[in-house]
Amino acid sequence: MTLWEMFTAAVLGIVEGLTEYAPVSSTGHMIIADDIWLKSGSLMNPEAANSFKVVIQLGSILAVAIVFKDRILHLLGLKKNVTRDQQKGYRLTIAQIAVGLVPAAVLGFLFEDFIDRYLFSVRTVAYGLIAGAVLMLIADWINKRKETIDTVDRITYKQAFCVGLFQCLALWPGFSRSGSTIAGGVIVGLNHRAAADFTFIMAIPIMAGASLLKLVKYWSSLSYDMIPFFLVGFICAFVVALLVVKFFLRLINRIKLVPFAIYRVILGIILIMLVR
């Protein structure tokens, strides 16, 4: 592996780790970092390049699974109650997570080919960034005017399903899965931290499943000499995502979504200018 290849793998892994769980759209940032700047597709065939993006996403998924390991073990019945609300009888269940996953899973299955073929343009992603920013600003405005649930253990099935409906917006590239679901959670009555917790926990099965399916699809395009390149990207994505998720969860109730919305609008405008 050349120095440039190592640099490319590291940068793309860092970008993935920074943006996968922050509500800023990892797709938009990967377009800037890869399609416009580094062009990893020139280092390998398109299928292998897609496989690399799946692998670094798996690094991010592993990071969030580690952050929520106690919660996951509790969901699986392998750990006793770990929070005060759980001791009072409130608890997030696998069924609630499933309810939240169904809408986007169904729409994604039905329209995957259409989305891949027609919606993955720079301009479409830019508009998604701006539209997602508007939703986030609306969520923060609503949050100031209503009481909210301060823990994910108190989420209802209705709220879980509504968050799942908002997640469908993330099928629009650039909208951001975490942006749409955190904003949706806030709109239906969760505080920012509870909405983020539900978003990240819900992300683990849906992202892991989608990533593994894509990896199987592109498996034949891989070769052993790509392993160092993939490993560098995976490690960078994992380490950075681990830090970002912990930092984000500590701050989100304080900073809300406005700073991310402003950043998204600026990035969307930059992307529109780049393709004019």
Swiss-Prot record:
Cellular location(s): Cell membrane
GO biological process, one term: peptidoglycan biosynthetic process
Family of the protein in this entry: Belongs to the UppP family.
Membrane topology term: Multi-pass membrane protein
The entry's keywords: Antibiotic resistance, Cell membrane, Cell shape, Cell wall biogenesis/degradation, Hydrolase, Membrane, Peptidoglycan synthesis, Transmembrane, Transmembrane helix
Keyword Transmembrane helix: yes
Cellular component, GO annotation: plasma membrane
Further information: Bacitracin is thought to be involved in the inhibition of peptidoglycan synthesis by sequestering undecaprenyl diphosphate, thereby reducing the pool of lipid carrier available.
Protein name: Undecaprenyl-diphosphatase
GO molecular function per UniProt: undecaprenyl-diphosphatase activity
Regions annotated as coiled coil: none
Function: Catalyzes the dephosphorylation of undecaprenyl diphosphate (UPP). Confers resistance to bacitracin.
Catalytic reaction list: di-trans,octa-cis-undecaprenyl diphosphate + H2O = di-trans,octa-cis-undecaprenyl phosphate + phosphate + H(+)
Pfam families: BacA
